């Protein structure tokens, strides 16, 4: 049976992650409080942040920025919007 968590992002009980997705204390908090669905949403947002801000993930400052954004996305007031992103018109 799948592990469930009370997802802090979605505000409902949902299937939990299979393993901590990030090292350290932040990864543990995400594992205990974030669902697979909410994590998938973060991965999409993270991709937009990397692309729109032209982040070089070999740069430690870019990785630190993404870690701060991840924490804000799940446990703070929300991550930065992707600057310059315009959603496709339907």
UniProtKB/Swiss-Prot annotation:
Q: Which GO terms describe its biological process?
A: cellular response to oxidative stress
- Spans traversing the lipid bilayer: none
Database matches in InterPro entries? Fe_traffick_prot_YggX, Fe_traffick_prot_YggX_sf
User: Disulfide bonds, which pairs?
Assistant: none
- GO CC annotation: cytosol
Q: Would you identify the family this protein belongs to, as annotated?
A: Belongs to the Fe(2+)-trafficking protein family.
Q: What does this protein do?
A: Could be a mediator in iron transactions between iron acquisition and iron-requiring processes, such as synthesis and/or repair of Fe-S clusters in biosynthetic enzymes.
Protein name per UniProt? Probable Fe(2+)-trafficking protein
- State the organism of origin: Paracidovorax citrulli (strain AAC00-1)
């Amino acid at each position: 049976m799948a592990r469930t968590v009370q997802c802090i992002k979605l505000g409902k009980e949902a299937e939990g992650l299979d393993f901590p997705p990030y090292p350290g204390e932040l990864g543990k908090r995400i594992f205990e409080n974030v669902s697979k669905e909410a994590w998938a949403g973060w991965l999409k947002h993270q991709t937009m942040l990397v692309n729109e801000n032209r982040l070089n993930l070999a740069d430690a400052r870019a990785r630190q920025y993404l870690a701060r954004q991840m924490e804000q996305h799940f446990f703070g007031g929300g991550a930065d919007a992707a600057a310059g992103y315009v959603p496709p018109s339907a």
